[in-house]
Every structure is written in structure tokens, then in C-alpha cells.
Regions:
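Short internal beta-strands
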Residues: 1-4, 95-96
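GT-A fold catalytic core of metal-dependent nucleotide-sugar glycosyltransferases
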Residues: 30, 34, 49-102, 125-126, ...
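Short, charged/polar "capping" segments at the starts of alpha-helices
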Residues: 4-11, 103
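Active-site-proximal specificity loops/subdomain of glycosyltransferases
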Residues: 8-58
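A glycosyltransferase accessory/donor-loop signature
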Residues: 126-270
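Conserved glycosyltransferase catalytic-site signature
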Residues: 50-54, 121, 152-157
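Short, surface-exposed amphipathic charged segments that create phosphate/polyanion-binding patches used
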Residues: 37-48, 107-112, 184-189
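Conserved catalytic core of nucleotide-sugar-dependent glycosyltransferases
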Residues: 85-143, 156
Length: 270
């Protein structure tokens, strides 16, 4: 689902998918479908296309009953059949709690009780039959038009409001976000042994902060992105950086190398 894509790039994707014995379909919604929305935050790196996430029930054919949505800053490292087979009876989506779920401001701004928590919309197993029956797309449009001042994190806020009573949470391994690898963030984890196992062996890895293609990314599993990139037609491509940026990167790393500053990320070998 995209506003547009060149025929050349469509063919590259068709060939890649066909090499694994599958096919791919492209959906290009009308330009005015998202006219009622606006980008509220991260406008320099997020386009209006993010709101397609709210409109899948209007975009996709009626015979599509379920969708696994994944952000583009994600690598799938293992079998997702367990996640795909999650029971979605009576709910709109299966999702994973956001690393920022404990920020009271979110619930005050969005006007729902924090006991329902807040999910990260980068990984969503969507029950499209439920969305059509409950007109989730229209609910998103109506909420944005009525309360635009409440929306900060774009479509993620909208979906959390509309689905706050109608979702099911699944384990972190299905959306292991950047913040869970960082020091200095209260993760409020009940079972640290289980949490550590999920950190070491995530199934869906989500680079929610610095992207692995950013030259200054410090993510401990950054290499996983390039491992899978090198299995595509874009094999060998790496971020380009000027001499100035490379020097800045070295200077940025020095305090961590000489342990003048505590590392940002956990050492997964500890």
C-alpha cells in the first residue's frame, strides 16, 4: 500500500518475492483518501502514508480478512506463524505494548484510562473483519476531525484511542523495540529471565530509534539488518557519510570506548 511506486521498483519487488515462491500485490489508494489527516510529529521523517494504517479496511479487498502490518524499520528473524495464529475473536488487533506506555501524558491527552495501556503501532496483526464491522477507518477520521489537538503521535495515537478496549497484547518478542535494549529506561519487567531471553532472541526486531542505515546507529543488533539486506538486490549497500560525519562519529564513540560515559545500550554478551 503506497501513494505510488515506479514500475521498475515494482518489478524488483515482484522478482524478489517470486524467488521465494510467493507473489505480491500493490495497492495505490486515491490521493484524497488521507485528506482529513495531518502529520503532527516527526514530520521530517514520516509522510502522510503513515495514515494508510488507519484505512486498511477501506483500501484492501473484502476477501482479505486479516493483515500483518510491519513498519519499514523492522527485520523478521524467525517463524511468525505463532503470532499469525493469535486468536483475534472479538478484538480489532493483536499488538505489543509501547516502550513509552507508562507516560501519564498520553492517557490524559487521549482521554482514556491508562489501565488499557498503549501499544506500538509498528507491528499490528489486524482483524479486518472486525475493522469493517466496527468501521474503524471512519472512527479514526471522525476522531481526528473532532479532536485534532489531542493527536500527537499521528495514526498511532488514533488507533490507540479507537482500539483501546478492543485489542489483545502479545509478548515483546513480536515487536522488540529499541528502548528495551537501552540503559536508563524503566522497563517495568516482571520476569527478567524471560525478558532477557526475548532480548537475545527476538522474532520481530524493531529499530524504533536510530535506524540501522544511519551511520551513527549503536544498536547492538544493527548487523541483523545488513545480514538480511545482503540477501536482496540491494546487497552491499551501506550508509554514505562524509569525512566530517565519520570524524563526528568517532568523537561520539570515544567517551564510550574509554568508559568515560555509560553505554547507551546493554551488552548482550553479559
Amino acid at each position: 500500500v503506497a501513494p505510488s511506486l515506479s514500475e521498475e521498483n515494482q518489478q524488483i519487488l515482484r522478482n524478489l518475492v517470486a524467488s521465494y515462491g510467493n507473489d505480491i500485490r500493490f495497492y495505490f489508494p486515491p490521493e484524497d483518501l488521507l485528506s482529513c489527516f495531518a502529520i503532527k510529529k516527526f514530520g521530517k521523517r514520516i509522510s502522510m502514508a503513515t495514515y494508510y494504517r488507519c484505512m486498511f479496511s477501506a483500501i484492501l479487498p473484502d476477501d482479505v480478512e486479516k493483515v500483518l502490518y510491519l513498519d519499514c524499520d523492522i527485520v523478521v528473524l524467525g517463524d511468525i506463524s505463532e503470532f499469525w495464529n493469535t486468536d483475534l475473536s472479538g478484538c480489532g488487533a493483536a499488538c505489543i505494548e509501547d516502550i513509552g506506555k507508562d507516560e501519564d501524558e498520553r492517557y490524559e491527552r487521549l482521554h482514556y484510562d491508562r489501565s488499557y495501556s498503549y501499544f506500538n503501532a509498528g507491528v499490528l496483526l489486524i482483524n479486518l473483519d472486525y475493522w469493517r464491522e466496527h468501521k474503524v477507518d471512519k472512527q479514526c477520521v471522525e476522531y481526528f476531525q473532532t479532536y485534532p489537538e489531542r493527536i500527537l503521535f499521528n495514526d498511532q495515537d488514533l488507533l490507540n484511542v479507537v482500539l483501546h478496549k478492543d485489542k489483545v497484547f502479545v509478548p515483546l518478542k513480536w515487536n522488540m523495540q529499541d528502548g528495551f535494549y537501552r540503559y536508563g529506561i524503566d522497563k517495568k519487567v516482571a520476569d527478567w529471565n524471560s525478558f532477557r531471553e526475548e532480548l537475545l532472541h527476538p522474532v520481530i526486531l524493531h529499530y524504533t530509534n536510530k535506524k540501522p542505515w544511519n551511520y551513527d546507529s549503536m544498536h547492538p543488533l544493527r548487523s541483523e539488518y545488513y545480514k538480511y539486506l545482503d540477501m536482496t538486490p540491494w546487497q552491499g549497500q551501506r550508509p554514505l557519510s562524509s569525512l566530517k560525519k565519520r570524524v563526528q562519529w568517532c568523537m561520539k564513540r570515544l567517551p564510550y570506548v574509554f568508559r568515560f560515559r555509560k553505554p547507551k545500550y546493554m551488552d548482550l554478551g553479559e
